[in-house]
């Protein structure tokens, strides 16, 4: 064999099979690079500052301010970069982006368990270019890190069930890392239980489930010990997080939204026009396919009669239970605690699988797993009264998978009898890929405009901090309060206390929807709170009348008050 033939064999064996994945990584890498440059100009957001300050502590450079109600895993990853000497907000952006791309690789591999390489590439690109993904990637939030670990956890779960039970160890480790990144990752217990039930006969060696659980405990024990030291209660952060889901919030609180259809209404703004096109084609395809099938009335009639006329009472009972549970889920959705809805939907999934399993649909268990994954987070975030577009991030992989599945199924059914029908989907995917890339190119320049307020806030706080350090050289020994506390603590590198927003005899953490109409009683409540806590200085984004404090400097909307 010649050197040329050896080279071609090497390329065909080791390079060509991975070309779609490599291309996907390159595209995502280029998009992420430009997104990083934009974020470096915008600066950190409030939550990012919390992660950065926690990371300073873990790197041995703590400044006195921490928020230990936030899970520790993401700050620990940032702390590794800090230990290498790169102490900057950019560290959080880079870690966020790198793990997001790591998650994208896992998503491609998960897709490849059912789809071919071209389809998996397209599904990965679809997920990577959802407007909500591009908009929020690189912010230095923990959502993408959690999402990446969840993706890999599900990938290893499928491998553990279908190929080698040893993968259960990796499944539990990634699930634990996801949980320690965002506590609501615990919700994947529902799709996991459903998937294991669907494949209970296929698990070859149950002992590796035990080994996986043990590995998870070894990973989580240091964190529990840390919480014991900080709070005197190893469960406090978990209780605080999940307790908030049952807490009553005032409608004045700015993220408050009781609409259970919040994420459905914003669906196409999160997923982009390309998802609208795909959804439209899926609906049209189903309609056309139904019309074609209905023409063959005898075929339809025979199938219906074969189901209805069966003397299988067990089947009829399952159909009845499925219908009742589905109706209960729909009627009670948004009216009961999210955990009730999660359990009802799990029951719906279990009954549905027992009904459809006899049809021998290829990888139906995988499709149900992904759908239940999406629903686990959709139910929780829709019922929880505190809503944010960023919470859609953990639903996005499931959406991309289901859109790809629907599109591929429709194309297969409608083109199966066409000559060269197998080329129609790749051609369509290529056209839509070009459209997606053009849309992404037009979206990137607009991101900075969307975060203009954050950029200005960072600029003003940086200037105010520099001025204040010169004005009060002993500032680290002063008691400082602010309603912009994470920003200020990061810029001053010192402890800054949380200042609540007082309105209508209530205290709000993080502001209110209407911050323009404060009464004298509201101002008095703010003043008394500062006095009672011996505040020397107060940095505020709101102009308020404080009887015990005077404004000494203003930078844009940032006002510095000093105690009289």
PLM region descriptions:
Residues 21, 173, 217, 314-326, ...:
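Signature aromatic-anchored transmembrane alpha helix within multi-pass, membrane-resident enzymes
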Residues 31, 50, 207-289, 296, ...:
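Membrane-lumen/periplasm interface segments of specific transmembrane helices
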Residues 46, 70, 132, 138-146, ...:
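Short acidic/glycine- and proline-prone juxtamembrane loop motifs at membrane-interface regions
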Residues 56, 143, 178, 187, ...:
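Hydrophobic/aromatic-rich transmembrane helices and adjacent perimembrane loops
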Residues 112-118, 153-168, 178, 359-360, ...:
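Membrane-interface transmembrane helices that cradle and orient dolichyl/undecaprenyl
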Residues 426-488:
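Membrane-embedded, lumen/periplasm-facing catalytic core of multi-pass transferases
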Residues 469-507, 535-541:
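Short periplasmic/luminal acceptor-recognition loop of GT-C membrane glycosyltransferases, typified by
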